[in-house]
């Protein structure tokens, strides 16, 4: 049966890459790692006004149930091993969103002896959301950018 005949009968044709990318990007389960004021904006995104549920995004309390970590706030040296431990407990494939100036590069506390100058020194970061604190719209835009990145990523990497 030719492709044109299948499409006329109502079948949708796609590749496995596109199907898996669509499924992964449409059911992201983030885990919050809120450390400071950025976490309040992260809570706004989960509330009724922005409603992440419509994107298939449901916050999970456990790293073993989540595939996205949102790091929001100042990461200090004492908290860095805990961040790495939680990241290692997440199943593959996993992604990280760095939210706010403090998580991106230390922010206001950049020159403090006890602050990690960016969570990307501890875990690999996929999307950076700028701002101090970033708005809920900025985080939502960052999540949509992560969804686009997941859709473009090949399923079987060598």
Curated annotation (Swiss-Prot):
Broadest EC class assigned to this enzyme: translocase
Q: What is its EC number?
A: 7.1.1.-
Q: How is the cofactor bound?
A: Binds 1 [4Fe-4S] cluster.
Give me any GO biological process, just one. Answer: aerobic respiration
Disulphide bonds annotated for this chain are: none
Q: Which residues bind [4Fe-4S] cluster?
A: 37-38, 102, 132
Indicate the principal place this protein occupies in or around the cell.
membrane
Q: Which GO terms describe its cellular component?
A: plasma membrane; respiratory chain complex I
Give the transmembrane region(s). none
**Which Gene Ontology molecular-function terms are recorded?**
4 iron, 4 sulfur cluster binding; iron ion binding; NADH dehydrogenase (ubiquinone) activity; NADH:ubiquinone reductase (non-electrogenic) activity; quinone binding
PROSITE patterns per record: COMPLEX1_20K
Subunit record text: NDH-1 is composed of 14 different subunits. Subunits NuoB, C, D, E, F, and G constitute the peripheral sector of the complex.
Protein name as annotated: NADH-quinone oxidoreductase subunit B
List the top taxonomic levels of the source. Bacteria, Pseudomonadati, Pseudomonadota, Gammaproteobacteria, Legionellales
């Amino acid at each position: 049966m030719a492709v044109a005949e299948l499409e006329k009968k109502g079948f949708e044709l796609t590749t496995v890459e596109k199907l898996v990318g669509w499924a992964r990007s449409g059911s992201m389960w983030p885990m919050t790692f809120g450390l400071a004021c950025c976490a309040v904006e992260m809570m706004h995104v989960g509330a009724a006004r922005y409603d992440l549920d419509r994107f298939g995004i449901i916050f999970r309390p456990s790293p073993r149930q989540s595939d996205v970590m949102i790091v929001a706030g100042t990461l200090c040296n004492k908290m860095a091993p805990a961040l790495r431990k939680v990241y290692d407990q997440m199943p593959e494939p996993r992604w990280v969103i760095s939210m706010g100036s403090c998580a991106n590069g230390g922010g206001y506390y950049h020159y403090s002896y006890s602050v990690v100058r960016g969570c990307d020194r501890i875990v690999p970061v996929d999307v950076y959301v700028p701002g101090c604190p970033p708005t809920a719209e900025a985080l939502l835009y960052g999540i949509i950018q992560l969804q686009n990145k997941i859709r473009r990523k090949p399923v079987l990497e060598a």
